């Protein structure tokens, strides 16, 4: 039987035959090649962080491990990626919290609106004991949580100007496919509409919906500002994303070198810091561009924001069993 090393050596000789590689020469490339799934395009902050992760792994393992990043959803949609990771079909991935919460309901609490007062509080929570507890819980899914990525803060944008909670009454607003998001819209006095993301522009243009919600980069990239030029900076949701490894991949790494799993965890944390920096730059750039284009931005006063928070408070009743956790988050 031909060994995997022999097959790789033969492949290397085929490619490098022109420079005199002979069949007796030993293959000197990586000993382990792992796959990383990312559904965003290559210039997106999360994909750039995945590429940084791959570079760090190659450097820290002295070339013994190679991580190949497949961007643009090449390895499938996030739900499929999560399932493939559970049996080791994919080794690493960046996935959204909302998708992972479908398999690990305990994570849903992190999607509650107005859970954090600002970004620094969120990172104190996720980079601290609470975040580590959530990452450890992924072991039940045969996954290893490496780090938390930034996915920005979501706000509303509309066809007509909205300044207060009362102005939202009766409006039809597009939200993600999520029971929690739909409930939030209802509690705010509006009507939720689940429109396919690629159709949101047309739905706004044709007045099928009155508004939608998302972060600054997405608002800019999809051109929604052209048909919904009023941005209500309410910052109702800060929902992070996760960088994961499959347990199967970590076992392979440990077999190769007992130091490698810890190296992977370190690379995961370092690449997450890079992603957050890249995201902050992109978010600031998008907001600046939108303001310059002429988008009218309304920032909620402290009093008005308190009204928004109070309106969605009933949603927290469904998380009574995690009330102590919510208190810990709010006190962080």
Feature-to-residue mapping (PLM):
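N-terminal secretory/targeting leader peptides
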Residues: 2, 8-120, 130, 138-332
């Amino acid at each position: 039987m031909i060994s995997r090393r022999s097959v790789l050596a033969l492949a290397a000789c085929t490619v490098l035959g022109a420079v005199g590689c002979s069949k007796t020469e030993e293959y000197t490339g990586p000993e382990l090649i792992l796959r990383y799934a990312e559904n965003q395009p290559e210039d997106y902050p999360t994909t750039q962080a995945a590429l940084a992760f791959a570079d760090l792994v190659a450097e820290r393992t002295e070339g013994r491990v190679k991580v190949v990043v497949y961007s643009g959803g090449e390895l499938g949609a996030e739900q499929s990626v999560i399932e493939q990771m559970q049996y080791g079909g994919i080794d690493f991935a960046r996935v959204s919290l909302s998708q992972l919460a479908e398999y690990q309901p305990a994570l849903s609490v992190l999607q509650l609106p107005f859970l954090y007062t600002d970004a620094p509080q969120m990172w104190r929570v996720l980079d601290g004991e609470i975040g580590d507890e959530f990452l450890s819980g992924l072991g039940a899914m045969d996954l290893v949580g490496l780090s938390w990525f930034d996915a920005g803060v979501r706000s509303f944008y509309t066809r007509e100007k909205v300044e207060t909670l009362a102005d939202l009454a009766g409006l039809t607003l597009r939200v993600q496919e999520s029971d929690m998001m739909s409930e939030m819209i209802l509690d705010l006095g509006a009507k939720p509409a689940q429109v396919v993301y690629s159709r949101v522009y047309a739905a706004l243009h044709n007045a099928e919906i009155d508004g939608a919600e998302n972060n600054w980069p997405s608002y800019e990239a999809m051109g929604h500002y052209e048909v919904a030029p009023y941005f209500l900076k309410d910052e109702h949701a800060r929902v992070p994303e996760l960088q994961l490894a499959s347990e199967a991949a970590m076992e392979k790494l440990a077999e190769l070198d007992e130091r490698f799993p810890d190296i992977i965890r370190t690379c995961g944390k370092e690449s997450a810091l890079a992603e957050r920096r890249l995201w902050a730059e992109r978010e600031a750039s998008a907001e600046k561009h939108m303001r310059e284009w002429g988008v009218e931005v309304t920032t909620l006063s402290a009093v008005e924001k308190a009204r928004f928070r109070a309106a969605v408070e009933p949603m927290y009743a469904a998380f009574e069993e995690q009330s102590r956790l919510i208190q810990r988050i709010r006190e962080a």
